[in-house]
Amino acid sequence: MNYDRIYPCDFVNGPGCRVVLFVTGCLHKCEGCYNRSTWNARNGQLFTMNTVKELASHLSKSYIQGLTLTGGDPLYPQNREEISNLVSWVKARFPEKDIWLWTGYKFEDIKQLEMLKYVDVIIDGKYEKNLPTKKLWRGSDNQRLWSNTDGVWKHD
């Protein structure tokens, strides 16, 4: 898996101050996408143990509320194994931090993924530039916010 960039403290991609990992690789190629440079899975840098150490260093700070995974698409097929390993490791190492994940896939098509038990919030659905929204943390009105409470997923 490759990644485009890491924000050590971001207030846009979820609540509070968050560490944000932008992965590369996306099949959706949404018209009007803000992160077109992340579509090609070969772009960016290789995700390595040093990347995990960098994320851990940022996540260890008390003012960090959690980790946000975006891109690209964290659930791009070639990213799934690495993302699964990452979210399980983050939950074990930093159980007090929440994990938010943005994906172009609909929740109904990914709900069977084992890794989702480690994720607290999913924003699902492709970005649709013709469906503007005022909903917090969504790029378009079709996108839904799914919350995981004790293994039960509900959307707004």
From Swiss-Prot:
UniProt cross-references to Gene3D superfamilies, sorted A to Z: Aldolase class I
Binding site for [4Fe-4S] cluster: 26, 30, 33
Pfam families: Fer4_12, Radical_SAM
Cofactor needs: [4Fe-4S] cluster
Annotated InterPro entries: Aldolase_TIM, NrdG, Organic_radical-activating, Radical_activat_CS, rSAM
Keyword Iron listed: yes
Subunit structure: Forms a tetramer composed of two NrdD and two NrdG subunits.
Function: Activation of anaerobic ribonucleoside-triphosphate reductase under anaerobic conditions by generation of an organic free radical, using S-adenosylmethionine and reduced flavodoxin as cosubstrates to produce 5'-deoxy-adenosine.
Protein name per its UniProtKB record: Anaerobic ribonucleoside-triphosphate reductase-activating protein
Lineage of source species: Viruses, Duplodnaviria, Heunggongvirae, Uroviricota, Caudoviricetes
